[in-house]
Amino acid sequence: MAKGRGTSGRARAVRATPARLLAVDITRQCRLRDAYVRELVNTRRKTSELSHEEFDYAQVLSFGVVMCRGTLDEFIDRNLNSPHDIKPEVRDCLRVSAYELLFLKKPSHAVVDQGVELVRASSPKASGLANAVLHKMAADAEGFPWGDASTSIRAFARSYGIPKWLARLLVRQYGREKAAAMLAADLLPAPTFLRDNPYQSGERFASDLSAQHVASLVPLAGTVLEIGAGRGTKTALMQARALEELGHPTIIHTVDIHEFKARLLSERMEQMGIAGVTTHVGDATNLDAIAGLPRAFDAVFIDAPCSGTGTLRRHPEIRWRIDPRDIESLTQIQARMLQSAASYVRAGGTLVYATCSVLDSEDDALVRAFLDTPAGAQFTLAERFASVPAEGGPDGHFAVVLRK
């Protein structure tokens, strides 16, 4: 066990709880390695000696710190005389305490005590500073979000641990009440939805309920081109439905720009007992440059790269990694994908465009702009689907079905 020094100079056992210590370590690794918190948590769970209850709390803290990082740092900096002078190792500890104070509403005396011990465990000389800062933070937390969230967009953004620019976009698009409900759901653990794998009796795989619906919109009677297939979850969903509805797997060609994802998809299909899938690696904004890719399909499914704003609770890093420039860049890529894919749809065929974004600029507005182009003018809108995050419900997804 790590040791600190008491006021008498004698060695003393650090009293920070194992769950909090683990959360500090996980979020520190996220910072140092630019790693994904979910992957670190899953890896640690396999070897952890913590009880299920302790580990689950460490996961709550780890996800929360990453999700609300910007708001937590603002809170910490409000209570420091010189924010830039604090060591990153100390800030790692204070972020855990800040999340407990602002979003978990834990008793302040317990948070202060544990926060001091967390700092003592990693930076013993800073424990005195931590004690003073944490007491200030505990008092300051009483006024959170430091404004009226019903009128101030800054206070509204703080309430849900998101950047102000994103809060403004969501309120403008959905209204304050609906945006608040979505963002409240995003602070809660994501529910797990399972789908039977008909290729392996008794086996299931995880997929969000809205993602399952999106995959169900793709016609499977003919050949299918799936763009942006990633690790193949929607590929598996389509082939599961093909076996149930057609009695056999359909023919699916997948395209992804990342070779390692194409390799993972192939391995996953083999593990799941799924046949009928051919992978291609290339840039989907220029399908003509992909060697060996057939030139016509009965259905083309674009699972577009997007902001992921419909899946914030599953991907805690998103909210503080993206900015408005990223959205603009993504919409340009999405538009180019639609233009490239349009000519690969046979006459009478179907083009399905989907995102896991809840932003209009990536969804309806982008589709409208495409339909106004010469390539898009060949298509008519046949069906539209949209969901937003809800407590205990599915994530935010968007899809349109276009007929040629």
Locations of the language-model features?
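S-adenosylmethionine
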Residues: 1-404
